[in-house]
């Protein structure tokens, strides 16, 4: 969340920046500021009452020493009344603080000053392209290829679990395992530490990264108030919640392979076939925790690390900088990697890399001590490195020759050095 004191001190600028997103945040900002005024007023009143109580308590002690018990008892009655007032004010303070926190949890991060301004993905800006968009004689959708090669059972998933679930079979299951291994090896070779994370997290972890309360309807919650992770970002980023890190520990680079779970609320009718939009999917995640000065450079490096995956498989892609209206709730700046799908004749997102600045760190209280000994909020970054189901879909469409699937060079060692699957 944002710092309410920063909001108050930069009210016009904050409103101006946030309203560049697809929405008007002026009202909720004003409500948060008003609640903070109330909070500070209550705190001041409590402080004055406690000061008065301390003075009266000293008088009671003096009177008792002088054996003026009647006067002392009168003052004790005043102290009792003050205690009652403080108790009521504490209750009011708790309520106001809860209301303020609720408002702040629904205010997104401030977009970076240098981001393109726009309303939606139509206003995103292409930064660069890599590779050649393939124009093929045999443009076949990836789900037909997967079905023909018996890589995915698209009927078993719905039979077992409902729509938007799939079952990888035989070489398809081997493909998932092989790709996760290749991606983790690639990222660990670049200095990321591999982590295996729980698939269930507590609500505090979801609040920490900003999934709650904004995206509650998109999450799977269990009967004991735990959440299935929507992304490996949640457990990885929360590993250092509540900690003060030494400067020499930064930057921290983590990677994990996990299954992820999303309700895909609001996606009815979109990508109903294939592997693009699933309730349960496979992903390799990248997370960085940095000092405040280096996060922008670390974001660019993270984008390059995600690009390395697509280059390894020689898949055409483009890098797109998201506009203010399309950037995610917790992000200050985001780049999407979009891979080429010949059958659809367009690029589709396969990775999203974001700098969340201190937005998540404030929720989690992830801090570090700088060179001068000052404690500061860390910056957090996250990115897909990459979404494996979408990577499989892209490989199928780009490497299908009409009769068989030509295996990319990086995959051949995992398939007994075969040239293709048919």
From Swiss-Prot:
L-serine binds at residues 231-233, 285, 384. It is found in: Cytoplasm. Transmembrane segments: none annotated. It catalyses: tRNA(Ser) + L-serine + ATP = L-seryl-tRNA(Ser) + AMP + diphosphate + H(+); tRNA(Sec) + L-serine + ATP = L-seryl-tRNA(Sec) + AMP + diphosphate + H(+). It is an enzyme of class 6 (ligase). One of its GO terms (molecular function) is ATP binding. Keywords: Aminoacyl-tRNA synthetase, ATP-binding, Cytoplasm, Ligase, Nucleotide-binding, Protein biosynthesis. Pathway: Aminoacyl-tRNA biosynthesis; selenocysteinyl-tRNA(Sec) biosynthesis; L-seryl-tRNA(Sec) from L-serine and tRNA(Sec): step 1/1. Its EC number is 6.1.1.11. PROSITE patterns: AA_TRNA_LIGASE_II (PS50862). It holds the Pfam family tRNA-synt_2b. Gene3D superfamilies: Bira Bifunctional Protein, Domain 2, Serine-tRNA synthetase, tRNA binding domain. One of its GO terms (cellular component) is cytoplasm. ATP binds at residues 262-264, 349-352. InterPro entries: aa-tRNA-synt_IIb, aa-tRNA-synth_II, aa-tRNA-synth_II/BPL/LPL, Ser-tRNA-ligase_type_1, Ser-tRNA-synth_1_N, SerRS_1_N_sf, SerRS_core, tRNA-bd_arm. GO terms for biological process: selenocysteine biosynthetic process; seryl-tRNA aminoacylation. Belongs to the class-II aminoacyl-tRNA synthetase family. Type-1 seryl-tRNA synthetase subfamily. Homodimer. The tRNA molecule binds across the dimer. Consists of two distinct domains, a catalytic core and a N-terminal extension that is involved in tRNA binding. PANTHER family: SERINE--TRNA LIGASE, SERYL-TRNA SYNTHETASE. Catalyzes the attachment of serine to tRNA(Ser). Is also able to aminoacylate tRNA(Sec) with serine, to form the misacylated tRNA L-seryl-tRNA(Sec), which will be further converted into selenocysteinyl-tRNA(Sec). This is Serine--tRNA ligase. The lineage of its organism: Bacteria, Bacillati, Mycoplasmatota, Mollicutes, Entomoplasmatales. The gene is serS.
């Amino acid at each position: 969340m944002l710092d309410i004191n920063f909001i108050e001190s930069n009210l016009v600028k904050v409103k101006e920046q946030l309203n560049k997103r697809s929405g008007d945040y002026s009202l909720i900002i004003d409500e948060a500021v008003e609640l903070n005024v109330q909070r500070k007023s209550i705190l001041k009143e409590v402080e004055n009452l406690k000061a008065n109580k301390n003075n009266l308590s000293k008088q009671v002690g003096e009177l008792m020493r002088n054996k003026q018990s009647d006067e002392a008892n009168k003052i004790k009655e005043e102290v009792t009344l003050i205690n009652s007032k403080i108790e009521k004010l504490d209750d009011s303070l708790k309520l106001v603080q809860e209301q303020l926190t609720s408002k702040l949890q629904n205010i997104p991060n401030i977009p970076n000053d240098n981001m393109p301004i726009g309303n939606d993905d139509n206003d995103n800006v292409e930064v660069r392209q890599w590779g050649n968009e393939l124009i093929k004689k045999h443009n076949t959708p990836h789900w037909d290829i997967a079905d023909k090669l018996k890589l995915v059972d698209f009927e078993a998933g719905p039979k077992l679990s409902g729509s938007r679930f799939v079952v990888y079979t035989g070489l398809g299951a081997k493909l998932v395992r092989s790709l996760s291994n290749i991606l983790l090896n690639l990222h660990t070779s670049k200095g990321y530490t591999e982590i295996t994370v729980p698939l269930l997290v507590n609500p505090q972890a979801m609040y920490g990264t900003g999934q709650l309360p904004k995206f509650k309807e998109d999450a799977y919650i269990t009967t004991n108030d735990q959440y299935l992770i929507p992304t490996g970002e949640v457990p990885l980023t929360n590993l250092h919640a509540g900690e003060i890190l030494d400067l020499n520990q930064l930057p921290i680079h983590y990677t994990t392979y996990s299954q992820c779970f999303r309700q895909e609320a609001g996606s009815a009718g979109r990508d109903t076939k294939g592997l693009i939009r699933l309730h349960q999917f496979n992903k390799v995640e990248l997370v960085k925790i940095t000092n405040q000065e280096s996060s922008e450079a670390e974001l660019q490096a993270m984008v390059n690390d995600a690009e390395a995956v697509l280059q390894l498989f020689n898949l055409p892609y483009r890098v797109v900088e998201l506009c203010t209206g399309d950037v995610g709730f917790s992000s200050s700046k985001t780049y999407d990697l979009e891979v080429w799908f010949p059958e659809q004749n367009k690029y589709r997102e396969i990775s999203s890399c974001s700098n969340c600045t201190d937005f998540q760190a404030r929720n989690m209280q992830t801090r570090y001590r700088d060179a001068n000994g000052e404690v500061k909020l860390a910056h957090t970054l996250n990115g897909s490195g990459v979404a494996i189901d979408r990577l499989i879909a892209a490989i199928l469409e780009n490497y299908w020759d009409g009769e068989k699937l030509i295996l990319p060079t990086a995959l051949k060692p995992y398939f007994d050095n075969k040239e293709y699957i048919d």
